[in-house]
């Protein structure tokens, strides 16, 4: 009879659209084919209404979770004389908007359209009675849900205790009240109150598990594998590898010798390079002898002029700005260089430098006074210079009145001291001092009397002369003199240039 199922705790599956309901059977109507549940739960959440009625046509599956004992269903009152199938399985359940419907048996494949379900309210959880028959089977869904809910709440209380303890003691905690706050609480429980089957009460023992790891055995296995595969061993204590990598070389190097150049006479002045190597100065007579011996061995004047012109032009290009100034974007701002040359070999060196500068798109203005007879070296250099875009002038009036980017001085020569008394020499010195452009002197002589053009930079050839402060900052260029040529004139020589052809020198 239908009254036999009153008070039973059942689980009704209404499909994916309506979900699963649990509750205690309060009424079974065979005429209208409906079943009512009191204190219902929808998908594990307490429902708003105290009672929900289902139609048989919307029931997909019906499970009996608990059958009440005798006398447990007397408080439900008189019920309709109806009958319910043995299990109710194979039927579907639907809910009307008013919570009522008809009980109609249908196959599991048929279902009705889902209906709206009333909203949930904040209803206090109630205890569910469990009969002695439940001891032989698993706990009901309601009991398991209540236990998991209490566990999840206690879990959150433990793990969120820092939030309450970190507040200021005098700071009041805001409280929420009302139905809306209760709904938010139920939503939090629905989101974060999942079933937690097991919460570990003890922390993980890291030290104990680390003690179980045999590191020595693992490292021995790795070393054995590397020896067999031929890879480099990691190294064992008290064992020294037979070979070292390039970055593991611990062999002590020889002490650094900074004085690698020794001259045969007393040194009046010494210089040093950026790396600390000592470069002594030599006298003009020894320098002249060095060039003469080099020329005898094949380093002719033409080669020396070419090498000097290349080194001087490289230094001048660097002083003009290098790639920042000489690039296709600055074609409209070509640097201007004024060359002041005398009628001697020093002047020929300047003309060679001007030719290389003109080949690098530098605007070169060459000043050379007119003489009836010129040296062959000067004639050859002028012939090459005339094939460039450089400009040659013989009068100081043709020199630019505005400042140029650089002035290269090649007027002085120790063998032609009388030229300093010439009007063109004095006029050229006056023009250079008034132009206010930086001056680079190529192979300047040692002046006994301070006069002429004060240079900002000076370029020495091979080995420097004992130049004074008027020479500015000293640079040294390599003109290709072999080491044995130095030894032939009594100089113990080791190149200080390294990877460069022009290096700066500093006063020691």
UniProtKB/Swiss-Prot annotation:
Tissue: Expressed in theca and granulosa cells in ovary, and in spermatids of the meiotic division part II and apical membrane of Sertoli cells in testis (at protein level). Also expressed in brain and mammary gland.
Phosphoserine modified-residue sites: 131, 138, 140, 161
Keyword RNA-binding: yes
A GO molecular-function descriptor: mRNA binding
Cellular localization per UniProt: Cytoplasm, P-body
Biological processes annotated in GO: deadenylation-independent decapping of nuclear-transcribed mRNA; P-body assembly
Domain of life where this protein originates: Eukaryota
Primary location group: cytoplasm
Comment on protein domains: The DFDF domain is unstructured by itself. It assumes a helical fold upon interaction with DDX6.
Family statement: Belongs to the EDC3 family.
Subunit record text: Homodimer (via YjeF N-terminal domain). Forms a complex with DCP1A, DCP2, DDX6 and EDC4/HEDLS, within this complex directly interacts with DCP1A and DDX6. Interacts with ZFP36.
Annotated PANTHER family: ENHANCER OF MRNA-DECAPPING PROTEIN 3
Disease (UniProt): Intellectual developmental disorder, autosomal recessive 50: A disorder characterized by significantly below average general intellectual functioning associated with impairments in adaptive behavior and manifested during the developmental period. MRT50 patients show mild intellectual disability and microcephaly.
Task performed by this protein: Binds single-stranded RNA. Involved in the process of mRNA degradation and in the positive regulation of mRNA decapping. May play a role in spermiogenesis and oogenesis.
The protein, known as: Enhancer of mRNA-decapping protein 3
């Amino acid at each position: 009879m239908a009254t036999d199922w009153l008070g039973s705790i059942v689980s009704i599956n209404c499909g994916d659209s309506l979900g699963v309901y649990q509750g205690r059977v309060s009424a079974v109507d065979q005429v209208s084919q409906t079943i009512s549940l009191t204190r219902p739960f929808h998908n594990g959440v307490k429902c708003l209404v105290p009672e929900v009625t289902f139609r048989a046509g919307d029931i997909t599956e019906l499970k009996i979770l608990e059958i009440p004992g005798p006398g447990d269903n007397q408080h439900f009152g008189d019920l309709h004389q109806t009958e319910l199938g043995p299990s109710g399985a194979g039927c579907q359940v639907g809910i009307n908007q008013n919570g009522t419907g008809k009980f109609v048996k249908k196959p599991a494949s048929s279902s009705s359209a889902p209906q709206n379900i009333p909203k949930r309210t904040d209803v206090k959880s109630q205890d569910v009675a469990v009969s002695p028959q439940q001891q032989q089977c698993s706990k009901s869904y309601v009991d398991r849900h209540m236990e998991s809910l209490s566990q999840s709440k206690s879990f959150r209380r433990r793990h969120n205790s820092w939030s309450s303890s970190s507040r200021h003691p005098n700071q009041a905690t805001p409280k929420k009240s009302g139905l809306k706050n209760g709904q938010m609480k139920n939503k939090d429980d629905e989101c974060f109150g999942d079933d937690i089957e097991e919460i570990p009460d003890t922390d993980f023992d890291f030290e104990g598990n680390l003690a179980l790891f045999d590191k020595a055995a693992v490292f021995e296995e790795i070393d054995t594998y590397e020896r067999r595969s031929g890879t480099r061993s990691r190294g064992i204590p008290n064992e020294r590898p037979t070979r070292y990598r390039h970055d593991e070389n611990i062999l002590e190097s020889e002490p650094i010798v900074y004085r690698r150049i020794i001259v045969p006479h007393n040194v009046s002045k010494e210089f040093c390079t950026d790396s600390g190597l000592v470069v002594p100065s030599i006298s003009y007579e020894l320098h002249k002898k060095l060039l003469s011996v080099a020329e005898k061995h094949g380093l002719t004047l033409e080669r020396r002029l070419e090498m000097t012109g290349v080194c001087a032009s490289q230094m001048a290009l660097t002083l003009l700005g290098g790639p920042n100034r000489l690039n296709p974007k600055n074609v409209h701002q070509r640097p201007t260089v004024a060359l002041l040359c005398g009628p001697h070999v020093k002047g020929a060196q300047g003309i060679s430098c001007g030719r290389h500068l003109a080949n690098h798109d530098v605007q070169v203005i060459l000043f050379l006074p007119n003489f009836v007879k010129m040296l062959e070296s000067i004639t050859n250099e002028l012939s090459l210079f005339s094939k460039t875009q450089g400009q040659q002038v013989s009068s100081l009036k043709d020199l630019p009145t505005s400042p140029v980017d650089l002035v290269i001085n090649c007027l002085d020569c120790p063998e032609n001291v009388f030229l300093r008394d010439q009007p063109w020499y004095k006029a050229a010195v006056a023009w250079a001092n008034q132009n206010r452009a930086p001056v680079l002197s190529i192979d300047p002589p040692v002046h006994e009397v301070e006069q002429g053009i004060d240079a900002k930079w000076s370029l020495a050839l091979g080995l420097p002369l004992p130049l004074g402060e008027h020479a500015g900052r000293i640079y040294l260029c390599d003109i290709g003199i072999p080491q044995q040529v130095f030894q032939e004139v009594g100089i113990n020589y080791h190149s200080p240039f390294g990877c460069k052809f022009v290096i700066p020198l500093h006063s020691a």
